[in-house]
Swiss-Prot record:
F-type ATPases have 2 components, CF(1) - the catalytic core - and CF(0) - the membrane proton channel. CF(1) has five subunits: alpha(3), beta(3), gamma(1), delta(1), epsilon(1). CF(0) has three main subunits: a, b and c. It is found in: Cell inner membrane. The lineage of its organism: Bacteria, Pseudomonadati, Chlorobiota, Chlorobiia, Chlorobiales. It comes from Chlorobium phaeobacteroides (strain BS1). It is a peripheral membrane protein. GO terms for biological process: proton motive force-driven plasma membrane ATP synthesis. This is ATP synthase gamma chain. InterPro entries: ATP_synth_F1_ATPase_gsu (IPR035968), ATP_synth_F1_gsu (IPR000131), ATP_synth_F1_gsu_CS (IPR023632). Pfam families: ATP-synt.
Length: 295
């Protein structure tokens, strides 16, 4: 049975841990607000670029741009995995890694067994996990979220495009966590390349406005495609960053509440042990007094 000193030491230790988790929750809440604002602000721009690409694709031969053209056969795949750099964020990284592993080993199982699936790991956690398990990692960005910058998104997009244009990969998939709300992040697996432009609603029904493009639609597409890829990668990174802070804030809040409950239980145990010790001492005193009276 634990002594009073043991219980008291444990209560003090849990109280110290609770202070840390509470502070981390407050820090994550402050970072979440900024990260959430950045992710939300990036969405309209990314969506508009996608819409413009869809509108232009109806007016040009998309086969003229290789990034818009499907390959007859997918022989090599590049999977981009966006995880965090730090832990203590609940199941955030575990869920992303689970989905990424499924994309690699199940959705592209035959290619994976033939060594035709490569990975690009953005974030330390994913890089550490997949490297230790012998997955083929062609490029990694550990420490990415310690100094998040658009130039890294552009570098990843250019790397993926270059590999696709050279024919070294026939498909690029991105696995990331999309921020929907604090309690409900959404795991996403999206095909980045080849680009499949989405037709806007008016053009689906044939009632689109006849725009005049200057320069030509094909020239605009050649400029728009790299911007689209850069923006999509950047948006995914911002979404993942916001989802990470939300997950960490929730995890630290849960840890703080658990510490509070554990301290409550330990204090009850401490008081009971203290009462038992006092009762034992009183019993010994009474027994001693009775023994003296008997003499």
């Amino acid at each position: 049975m634990a002594t009073l000193k043991d219980i008291r030491t444990r209560i003090q230790s849990i109280a110290s841990t609770q202070q840390v988790t509470k502070a981390m929750k407050m820090v994550s809440a402050a970072k979440l607000r900024r990260a959430q604002d950045s992710a939300i602000q990036a969405r309209p721009y990314a969506a508009k670029l996608k819409e413009m690409l869809g509108s232009l694709s109806t007016r040009v031969d998309t086969t003229l741009n290789p990034l818009l053209s499907d390959r007859d056969e997918v022989k090599n795949v590049l999977v981009v995995v966006i995880t965090s750099d730090r832990g203590l964020c609940g199941a955030f990284n575990a869920n992303i890694i689970k989905i990424a592993q499924k994309v690699v080993t199940e959705e592209h199982g035959d290619l994976y067994r033939d060594g035709k699936v490569e990975m690009l790991c953005a974030g330390s956690k994913g890089n550490d996990y997949f490297r230790k398990r012998g997955f083929s990692i062609s490029k990694a960005y550990p420490g990415l979220f310690q100094n998040l910058h658009f130039s890294v998104a552009r570098e990843i997009a250019e790397y993926a495009s270059e590999r696709y244009l050279k024919g070294e990969v026939d498909k690029v998939v991105v696995v990331y966590n999309e921020f929907k709300s604090v309690l409900a992040p959404v795991l996403k697996s999206e095909v980045l390349l080849p680009i499949t432009p989405e037709k806007v609603e008016g053009e689906k029904t044939g009632s689109s406005i006849d725009y005049i493009y200057e320069p030509s639609p094909s020239a605009i597409i050649d400029v728009l495609v790299p911007k689209h890829l850069n923006t999509q990668i950047w948006r995914m990174m911002l979404e993942s960053n916001a989802a990470e802070h939300a997950s960490r804030m929730t995890a630290m809040d849960s840890a703080t509440e658990n510490a509070k409950e554990l301290m409550r239980v330990l204090k009850i145990s401490y008081n009971r042990a203290r009462q038992a010790a006092i009762t034992t001492e009183l019993s010994e005193i009474v027994a001693g007094a009775e023994a003296l009276q008997g003499e």
